[in-house]
Amino acid sequence: IDLSKISDFNYAPKDKSISHSQVLFKDYNGDNVILIIKEMCDVLTKRLRAMNKCTKVISFGIGYSRSVGGGFYHSFKRDVPTSDTKEICNDCLRIFDKYYEDLPIRKVSIALGGLSDDTGMQLNLFESIEEKVHNKSKDKVVDSIKDKFGANSIIKASSLLPDSTAIERNKKIGGHSAWSLWN
């Protein structure tokens, strides 16, 4: 028996990542789960920007309902790291469109890996510089409002739709009810 303390080992992971997954309260189809994917991308990219990091690897997974079982989990490696909500969401939706089999969905998972410091913006000839700068500024403003006034202080209109989980999820801590904090 090895009686060594775990704290005696200096272990540093080679690659850090952040992730978010959600078990849904009901079965979702391919159309209404897109709202959940976008909401989860908003949450993850806010965390990414708060860490002042960019991601190069986007992993996305779907768990189907128990009635059918199974699911998929795939990764996409970007050429250029990003912290842009729209770009990361589009990557997730690309994976979803490629692998989704039109079955009832009960779980959505997203992970962002290959993290690096956010040192600037990589530009190319095929993208509008103005749009990239605008998106980055918009994301920072929305993040600062949410930090100052709470996650539900500024929401997208789509978060008011019946299939949205964002407002209720924002009232939870680690997926558990934070009732005493809100009442």
Regions found by a protein language model. Give the residues of each.
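Acidic, metal-coordinating catalytic segment for phosphate/diphosphate chemistry
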Residues: R78-N183
